[in-house]
Amino acid sequence: MSVEIGLTFANAGESSQREFWSALEDGGELLAFATSFTGQTISDPRLLHEAVTHPSCVSKPCRSYQTLEWAGDAAVCLAARNWLFHRKEKLSVPTLVVLESTLTSNQSLAYIGHLNGVHRVIDHRMSELPSRFESYKFQLKRGLWATDPPKVVPDVVESLIGAVHVDQGVE
């Protein structure tokens, strides 16, 4: 079954969806993964499920990650700016802008997501996505900036951070 952590949900049947919801309601492995990844506990399981649901899951009873990704994008940028402001205050603004762009780029976020297994928890209905994850893994051997990561990974990284932001507010 594709419900357990470590597998994507490509073409998962309705029984897998029920098991996934049940695991969410029980706390489940997805909650443990998200807590480990973000360092925060997301108290609303619906937000957690939304954070990993790709738009290809149109028949799902929840929204896709897109709105949480939008919120997470802002939170990631703010966190990067805060980190740079306090640790690199002597750098010029143009240099800070370049560093912020680098820290928040799809390549950087995809790499962080890949290292932490974000690609394994994405609920999707895209048959080509698992092979894109494998291709990305091999592209990394040429260097981070030589990659074309599947956009879904940095999107879900941002949406998980967005879920924390929505669930807990700004701190």
Predicted regions, residues:
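RNase III-family endoribonuclease catalytic core
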Residues: 2-171
